[in-house]
């Protein structure tokens, strides 16, 4: 049986990536310095982060401790990534600069591409790759 999903102004259909971070992580200051706002944070008994919801200019995402029981590990343990977080922003250069100042590692500087995008890429302190982008043509 197929069911149609109708979004209202109150409940829009959107993606909210869940980024896995190492177990026993206590500090996510990078994301706050990068411009994220914390909505909520659930901590384990030892104070480490279980899950936190963050938002950057309306784009919601979650950080969650590693859950190896179903194969979810963070990029550092995996020695690589299987996806890239694409974030569309009004000013690619400003966001790239802010990320680098907050502690990210630049993978590729912001530049214009023939396919009509301005893009730059960085790796955050937990190993996640972010593609910062804007349509330009």
Please provide the spans of the model-predicted regions.
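C-terminal catalytic core of tyrosine-transesterase DNA break-rejoin enzymes
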Residues: 126
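Vicinal oxygen chelate
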Residues: 1-18, 29, 34-88, 96-123, ...
């Amino acid at each position: 049986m197929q069911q149609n999903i109708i979004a209202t102004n109150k409940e829009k259909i959107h993606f909210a990536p869940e980024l896995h971070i190492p177990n026993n992580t206590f500090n996510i200051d990078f994301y706050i310095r990068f411009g994220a706002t914390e909505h909520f944070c659930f901590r384990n008994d030892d104070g480490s982060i279980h899950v936190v919801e963050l938002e950057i200019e309306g784009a919601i995402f979650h950080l969650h401790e590693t859950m190896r029981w179903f194969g979810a590990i963070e990029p550092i343990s995996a020695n690589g990534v299987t996806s890239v977080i694409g974030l569309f922003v009004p000013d690619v250069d400003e966001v790239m600069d802010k990320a680098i100042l907050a502690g990210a590692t630049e993978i590729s500087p912001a530049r214009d591409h023939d396919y009509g995008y301005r893009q730059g890429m960085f790796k955050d302190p937990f190993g996640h790759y972010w593609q910062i982008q804007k349509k330009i043509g």
